[in-house]
Swiss-Prot record:
E.C. code: 6.3.5.7
Keywords: ATP-binding, Ligase, Mitochondrion, Nucleotide-binding, Protein biosynthesis
Similarity section: Belongs to the amidase family. GatA subfamily.
Function per UniProt: Allows the formation of correctly charged Gln-tRNA(Gln) through the transamidation of misacylated Glu-tRNA(Gln) in the mitochondria. The reaction takes place in the presence of glutamine and ATP through an activated gamma-phospho-Glu-tRNA(Gln).
Stored InterPro entries: Amidase, Amidase_CS, Amidase_dom, AS_sf, GatA
Organism from which the protein derives: Emericella nidulans (strain FGSC A4 / ATCC 38163 / CBS 112.46 / NRRL 194 / M139) (Aspergillus nidulans)
Residue numbers annotated as active site: 62 (charge relay system), 141 (charge relay system), 165 (acyl-ester intermediate)
Pfam families, A to Z: Amidase (PF01425)
Gene Ontology MF: a single term: glutaminyl-tRNA synthase (glutamine-hydrolyzing) activity
Subunit-structure text: Subunit of the heterotrimeric GatCAB amidotransferase (AdT) complex, composed of A, B and C subunits.
Protein name stated in the entry: Glutamyl-tRNA(Gln) amidotransferase subunit A, mitochondrial
Major subcellular location class: mitochondrion
Length: 506
């Protein structure tokens, strides 16, 4: 199929799938240059002069990534009139590679949510394994991205992953979701939720497509202070022996770790079945399976929901309606500036954002910071230590372990990657999530991140790949798709992608 015909198909699918609400600003409603861009890419292809493997491909962007030609709203009333004067670095990199912006996708407001229902533009709907009367959760916060990819409204999509916001939607929609190591991809032009956790991630239908996007974006950006420098990238490559990755995979079987703490009682039978099938398949391929203990996992989720809201409460203080965004028009002669500020923020932010701002402000308060924020930072360091102790490869940017005996033991018994479920259950229905009679709905949504948060706290690369399983009714394999997560040592992104491809071939 020519790139132009492919582009026309994506635009048609955006129009026919409007009810899914995957896009806030779809290309079909935005007069752009996509037709000419796709035609030009076709010409370059016939001449053998494609700019990259993504030339002429439709890439959708989560609506918290700044684009010059499309509004950037973060799915919030506070930014519903905002258009950035510049492109984010990742947008510019993809446009330079010939990719076409396919539109801006829906999300939980400012990236805060697990089901893509906290958007001022309405819920994102997922129809996988459901009929139109029972829409399923698309996961969050990058649910619009995942649904757009799953329903062929774009070739791939770029979003953000703070505690699982790429991987959870991938698991719920049967797509591939890749979160690279923290700092490899530029965050310049990405509207922040939690700076120390936010990572630009990729959603696609195949691991190979996610790799193509990653290869274009995996570059140092001097404008982003969290971007890994060229010297550090060289150190990562040298320490992890990345140039010899193929020989690493063929010289010996992989040692694959099963995190014991991820085998929880709440794990759905279909998810457990998919996990077991994946491990058995890898064992049949000659790889070694061994249990691994990550004792701080049980505290990771609590630490995350202290740290992320704390950073968010600081980041979102800038939205006052003065410099940009929506400003409250409720004005009287006697009102103070403080009243206007409070009124603007009260009207502009949704309930989940307000909840997390309050949580974050409390954990940073003088009476709570020692017992909450400081303790959460300590737990975060211990979570990373758990991973470092489990992996055979030493963290390439961390201080070297001085205990030679411990390092030798890790080299002999350490694992190459961890494999776990991405989410403990299949996607719930939208009606179940929004049922006001269910008092635990907010807490349940937080618990959905239990398997994805640890890798985020440690800044590790992780990918979610769809794998077949069975449900409670005994439906045949293939009826249920569960997300299986592969986690690697920091900087070992290529190995994570390779193992993801192994699972994809299953």
């Amino acid at each position: 199929m020519s790139l132009l015909l492919e582009a026309e198909r994506y635009v048609a699918n955006q129009s026919s799938n409007r009810m899914l609400n995957a896009f806030i600003t779809p290309l079909c409603r935005h007069s752009g240059r996509w037709h000419d861009q796709a035609k030009d890419a076709d010409i370059r292809g016939k001449q053998g002069k494609l700019r990259s493997r993504l030339d002429g491909r439709f890439i959708a962007f989560k609506d918290n990534i700044c684009t010059r030609d499309f509004p950037t709203t973060c799915a919030s009333k506070s930014l519903d009139t905002f258009t950035s004067p510049f492109n984010a670095t990742v947008v510019q990199q993809l446009e330079d590679a010939g990719a076409i912006v396919a539109g801006k996708t829906n999300l939980d407001e400012f990236g805060m949510g697990s089901h893509s229902i906290y958007s001022s533009f309405g819920h994102v709907m997922n129809t996988r394994r459901g009929d139109d009367s029972k829409f399923l959760s698309a996961g969050g916060s990058s649910g619009g991205n995942a649904v757009a990819v799953a329903t062929d409204q774009c070739y791939a999509a770029l979003g953000t992953d703070t505690g699982g916001s790429i991987r959870l939607p991938a698991a719920y929609t049967g797509t591939v979701g890749f979160k690279p190591s923290y700092g490899l991809l530029s965050r310049w032009g990405v509207i922040a939720y939690a700076n120390s956790l936010d990572t630009v991630g990729i959603l696609a239908k195949r691991v190979s497509v996610a790799r193509d996007v990653f290869d274009v974006l995996n570059k140092h950006d001097p404008r982003d202070p969290t971007s890994i420098s060229p010297s550090s990238r060289s150190r990562i490559s040298s320490k992890l022996n990345l140039p010899q990755l193929t020989s690493r995979l063929t010289s010996r079987p992989l040692r694959i770790g099963i995190p014991l703490e991820y085998n929880i009682s709440e794990l759905a039978p279909s998810v457990r079945q998919a996990w077991c099938h994946s491990l058995e398949y890898l064992r049949q391929q000659g790889h070694t399976i061994q249990p691994v203990s990550l004792p701080m996992t049980k505290l990771a989720l609590s630490a995350y929901y202290v740290l992320a809201p704390a950073e968010a409460s600081s980041n979102l203080a800038k939205y006052d309606g003065v410099r940009y965004g929506t400003r409250s028009d409720d004005s009287t002669e006697n009102q103070s500036e403080t009243y206007l500020y409070a009124k603007t923020r009260g009207a502009g932010f949704g309930p989940e954002v307000k909840r997390r701002i309050m949580l974050g402000a409390f954990s940073l308060s003088a009476q709570a910071i020692d017992n909450y924020f400081i303790q959460a930072q300590r737990i975060r360091r211990l979570v990373r230590h758990d991973f470092d102790a489990a992996f055979q490869a030493e963290h390439p940017l961390a201080a070297e372990i001085r205990n030679v005996e411990l390092r030798q033991q890790a080299k002999q018994t350490g694992i190459d990657v961890l494999i776990s479920p991405t989410a403990p259950t299949p996607p719930p229905t939208i009606s179940d999530i929004t049922d006001t009679s269910t008092k635990r709905s907010n807490l349940d949504a937080y618990i959905n991140d239990v398997f994805t948060v640890p890798a985020s706290l440690a800044g590790l690369p992780a990918i979610s790949v769809p794998v077949s399983g069975k449900d409670n009714a005994g439906n045949q394999e293939g009826d249920i798709l569960a997300g299986i997560q592969v986690i690697g040592q920091y900087g070992d992104d290529e190995l994570v992608l390779k193992v993801g491809e192994l699972l994809e071939r299953r």
